[in-house]
């Protein structure tokens, strides 16, 4: 897709204070210098293969397919990456840029903790100091990931302001960056000011580069659907990237409907949001009546973000991607279904995408093919799911 510098259609741009803009210009310069550099690419691919364990399998979910009785379902197994999610794809790329910029300290925000864990690991690997900002609410929900980050030498800062979730962690991380302009900000999703959405796309496109090759090997044709969950949107951008030009492939992004789209307890930016500026970018976001970013909710700490990446906003308006939403309950049921039919425990974020496939597959012919991007594994969610089911049973 043609991108006017920093924009996807009307979306994107860079709405930040001047000191940050100067850093973004340096980052863009470094990225442009190295993104096609054979030595940089070789080093990046080396770490993807030998450190992260790529490529990840494209797995035919035979039992789930039989259970649903419709389209063939394949799972792109990003949960099998080192550390359990797609996040490391992007972090390795950004850390290698940081290294070339001679940075010694990295800052990151995290929601579910997966990006924080990936950043902590890469910082440990390359001998960098690491500070991770995480909403206090998410610290409680994702205690396991907090310990993982700390074990790898990162300092985790619990953010008590606002809704104490991902949006507040992003704000705090930007604040910390303003206070130490020599640090490198490793942004975890395809959001924020230019050039971050473009950089994250570049380092996540490996997902669909692999899945496209793999499905052609297995089925001799492209899929009919690719489905991925959308919070900020990095796993979905990676999963969709190489199919955007293939009009016959339907792309479906699944947001968090929380307690329902008719409540104020959701994070369905595309369905319920309007266009505005949030976190340095012009995109869709959920705003309150006062014009400020509204609190959002999801059982999933990785999806409760009130904005969305500008490239997704562009895909919505152009009609290339269909955006839908799944409730907490639908996501939990999908998580349990995949666990019981395939012995694969997906992250609660990924389970939103699985929930949509569960709705669609039975309505499709058996010769249709769906690829679901399983963006992460669900070990981190076991306690929260147990609490959810217990509370539901008590009602």
Where are these regions (language model features)?
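A short, small-residue-rich loop immediately preceding and capping a beta-strand
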Residues: 82, 98-135, 222-235, 251-254, ...
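Active-site/ligand-binding loops adjacent to catalytic centers
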Residues: 170-195, 245-248, 253-344, 387-395
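Active-site/ligand-binding-proximal alpha/beta "capping" segment
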Residues: 180-230, 312-314, 333
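Claisen-condensing/thiolase-fold acyl-transfer catalytic domains that form or cleave C-C bonds
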Residues: 230, 234, 328-387, 391-393
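Short glycine/serine/threonine-rich phosphate/pyrophosphate-binding segments
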Residues: 88-94, 108-126, 140-143, 229-240, ...
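Active-site-proximal loop->helix
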Residues: 107, 115-173, 262-273, 381-390
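Active-site nucleophile and cofactor-binding loops and adjacent substrate-binding regions
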Residues: 77-88, 106-115, 162-163, 204, ...
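Positively charged, low-complexity intrinsically disordered leader regions
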Residues: 3-12, 25-103
């Amino acid at each position: 897709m043609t991108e006017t510098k920093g924009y996807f259609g009307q979306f994107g741009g860079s709405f930040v204070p001047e000191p940050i803009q100067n850093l973004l210009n340096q980052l863009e310069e470094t990225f442009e210098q190295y993104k096609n550099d054979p030595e940089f690419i070789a080093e990046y691919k080396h770490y993807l293969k030998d450190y992260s364990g790529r490529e990840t399998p494209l797995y035919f979910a035979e039992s789930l397919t039989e259970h649903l009785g419709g389209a063939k379902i394949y799972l792109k197994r990003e949960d099998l990456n080192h550390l359990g999610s797609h996040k490391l794809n992007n972090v390795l790329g950004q850390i290698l840029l940081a290294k070339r910029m001679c940075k010694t300290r990295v800052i990151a925000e995290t929601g579910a903790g997966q990006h924080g864990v990936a950043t902590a690991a890469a910082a440990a690997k390359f001998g960098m100091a690491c500070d991770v900002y995480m909403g206090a609410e998410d610290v409680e929900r994702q205690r396991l990931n907090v310990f993982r980050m700390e074990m790898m030498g990162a300092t985790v800062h619990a953010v008590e302001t606002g809704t104490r979730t991902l949006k507040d962690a992003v704000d705090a991380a930007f604040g910390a960056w303003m206070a130490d302009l020599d640090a490198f900000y490793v942004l975890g999703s395809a959001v924020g000011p230019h050039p971050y959405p473009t950089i994250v796309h570049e380092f996540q496109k490996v997902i669909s580069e692999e899945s496209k090759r793999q499905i052609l090997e297995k089925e001799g044709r492209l899929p009919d659907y690719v489905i991925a969950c959308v919070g900020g949107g990095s796993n979905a951008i990676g999963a969709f990237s190489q199919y955007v030009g293939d009009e016959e492939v339907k792309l479906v992004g699944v947001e968090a409907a929380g307690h329902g789209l008719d409540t104020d307890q959701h994070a369905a930016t595309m369905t319920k949001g309007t266009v505005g500026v949030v976190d340095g970018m012009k995109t869709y976001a959920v705003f309150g009546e006062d014009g400020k970013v509204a609190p959002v909710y999801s059982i999933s700490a990785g999806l409760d973000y009130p904005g969305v990446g500008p490239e997704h906003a562009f895909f919505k308006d152009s009609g290339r991607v269909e955006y839908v939403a799944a409730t907490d309950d639908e996501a939990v049921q999908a998580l349990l279904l995949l666990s019981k039919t395939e012995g694969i425990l997906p992250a609660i974020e990924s389970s939103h995408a699985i929930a949509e496939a569960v709705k669609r597959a039975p309505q499709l012919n058996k010769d249709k093919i769906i690829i679901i991007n399983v963006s992460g594994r669900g070990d981190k969610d076991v306690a929260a799911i147990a609490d959810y089911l217990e509370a539901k049973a008590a009602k």
